[in-house]
A protein has these predicted regions:
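Glycine-rich cofactor phosphate-binding loops and adjacent beta1-alpha1 units
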Residues: 165-177, 214-287
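Residues in the short beta-alpha loop(s) of Rossmann-like NAD(P)-binding domains
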Residues: 205-209, 265, 295
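NAD(P)H dinucleotide-binding glycine-rich loop of Rossmann-like/cofactor-binding domains
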Residues: 94-177, 181
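Residue-level marker of beta-strand positions
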Residues: 65, 83-84, 99, 128, ...
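C-terminal substrate-binding/catalytic core of Rossmann-like NAD(P)-dependent dehydrogenases/reductases
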Residues: 269-319
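C-terminal hydrophobic helical "lid"/dimerization subdomain
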Residues: 247, 297-347
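Glycine-rich beta-strand-centered segment in the early N-terminal region that forms part
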Residues: 22-36, 51-98, 140-142
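Mid-domain Rossmann-like dinucleotide-binding core that forms the NAD(H)/NADP(H) cofactor-binding site
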Residues: 143-227
């Protein structure tokens, strides 16, 4: 079968290669790939900056944003031929640590977790893949090809779950205004879930051309180019990872405000910061800043529910390009108006 593979640590080694059929040891459920989402992590792996091949192998099958249909499944596993499904990315560490033992592998304490298409496990970027039933999510059939958004949606679902848990420290916490920084796939899905929670939503992005402002408006949210135009938010979901944006939103929230950092930054840049002023503001206003990454099964389930409730046409607007597998290279060549690019295995 064909698969998108890379040699981790070697820049631009990505290629469409022929690989063996997935072994039963990968999981009891055989899935035929329909689509594969492309994200920044994939580009980092392709650039040789990140990623680990499975032990004893030179190449890694790329891809962690999956969508497929069950081709074969054992009786009693909860899945049947034809089910629309997506695979969970992370697997718990082998020790396991207390978090992984409790099913919260997204909070792994020792770093020995593995990840499909990223760290020591082949990904979902092949014509067929196998998955363990416990790491497979069944999607609403009505979602069809839009189900490929489940992985970024799961990351957002975790962020919102933790925001609610932290907010519960104050019995009378009743947030009204949410700010999402960044109108990429994660930011737009964060805004979607905020609207589903009944919040007044503002979205900040540096680009007011292309489809992003229209998607924000169609959601019933307000698009901004400048932070000064945004009302004081109760919740901030930071999705850019841009240091300058992070500095701008620190301490900008309302009393008892919560800032979730969901974007990953690259290091090496320094910015001036009034630490004393920031500390004073955070202490006196009961502010919380926390980071959030990855997702566990409960978050995938919440994401699947959120996508099923969403307007299909709006979700379709997030996917700006679908590239057939035969022209796969185009999917990894960014274009100006890209939001989410998908490799179409069914075309």
């Amino acid at each position: 079968m064909h698969a998108l593979t890379v040699r981790p640590g070697t820049p631009n080694s990505i290629d469409l290669t022929t690989v063996p059929e997935p072994p039963p040891s990968d999981g009891a459920v055989l899935v035929r790939a329909l689509a594969l989402g492309v994200c920044g992590t994939d580009r980092e792996i392709i650039a040789g900056q990140y990623g680990w091949a499975p032990p004893g192998e030179e190449r890694l099958i790329l891809g962690h944003e999956s969508l497929g249909r069950v081709e074969d499944a054992p009786d009693g596993c909860g899945f049947a031929k034809g089910d629309l499904v997506a695979g969970i990315v992370r697997r718990p560490d082998p020790v396991p640590c207390p978090a992984c033992a409790a099913g919260a592998w997204d909070m792994c304490r020792n770093g020995r977790y593995t990840e499909r298409g990223i760290k020591e496990r082949n990904g979902y970027g092949s014509e067929f893949f196998r998955v363990e039933p416990d790491f497979l999510i069944k999607l609403d059939p009505a979602l069809g090809p839009l189900g490929v958004l489940i992985e970024p949606a799961s990351v957002v679902a975790k962020a919102w779950q933790h925001v609610r848990r932290i907010g519960g420290r104050a019995p009378a916490w009743t947030p009204r205004v949410a700010l999402v920084t960044g109108a990429g796939p994660v930011g737009l899905l964060a805004a979607l879930m905020a609207k589903q929670m009944g919040l007044v939503v503002h979205v900040l992005d540096h680009n007011d051309t292309g489809p992003k402002p229209k998607l924000v408006a169609a959601l019933g949210a307000t698009f901004h180019l400048a932070l000064d135009d945004v009302p004081c938010p109760d919740i901030v979901i930071e999705c850019t990872g841009a240091p300058s944006v992070i500095l701008d939103v620190l301490g900008r929230s309302a009393p008892d405000g919560i800032l979730c950092l969901a974007g990953v930054s690259s290091g090496g840049r320094q910015f001036p910061l009034d630490v004393g002023g920031l500390n004073r503001n955070m202490v006196l206003e009961n502010h919380v800043v926390f980071g959030s990454v990855n997702a566990n099964r409960a978050h995938y389930a919440a994401a699947a529910e959120a996508l099923a409730r969403a307007d299909r046409d709006w979700l379709a607007g997030i996917i700006t390009r679908r590239v057939p597998l035969a022209r796969w290279r185009e999917a990894f060549e960014p274009q100006e108006d890209d939001i989410k690019v998908v490799v179409d295995f069914a075309a």
